[in-house]
From Swiss-Prot:
GO cellular component terms attached to this protein's record: ribonucleoprotein complex; ribosome
Gene behind the chain: rpsJ
Statement: the UniProt record of this protein carries the keyword Ribonucleoprotein: yes
Molecular-function GO terms, alphabetical: structural constituent of ribosome; tRNA binding
Reported function: Involved in the binding of tRNA to the ribosomes.
Protein name: Small ribosomal subunit protein uS10
Organism: Alteromonas mediterranea (strain DSM 17117 / CIP 110805 / LMG 28347 / Deep ecotype)
Length: 103
């Protein structure tokens, strides 16, 4: 696969899980002889929700919740057939969303 690039975007709520999955991908790609660029940490998305505690009065009584979405980017430059095969067989954690694009 000459002059190709595989771009892998990872998303997860747990930063330890996403770092572990990224390390597995990088180690697998390097072991099969491909060049790796990354992992590049992308900005973390923070979603905040404010909920009223009391059902009727007391507008000042509220709870605030936050969900953080961590993202990483890994580029695999000039992958070999062995690299693609190893990445397809790689079993990642269930809490990690993986998007793969060829470029």
């Amino acid at each position: 696969m000459p002059n190709q690039r595989i771009r892998i975007r990872l998303k997860a709520f747990d930063h330890k899980l996403i770092d572990q999955s990224t390390a597995e991908i990088v180690e697998t790609a390097k072991r099969t002889g491909a060049q790796v660029s990354g992992p590049i940490p992308l900005p973390t998305r923070k979603e905040r929700y404010t909920v009223l505690i009391s059902p009727h009065v007391n507008k000042d009584a509220r709870d605030q919740y936050e969900i953080r979405t961590h993202k990483r980017l890994v580029d695999i430059i000039e992958p070999t057939d062995k690299t693609v095969d190893a990445l397809m067989r790689l079993d990642l954690a269930a809490g990690v969303d993986v998007q793969i694009s060829l470029g």
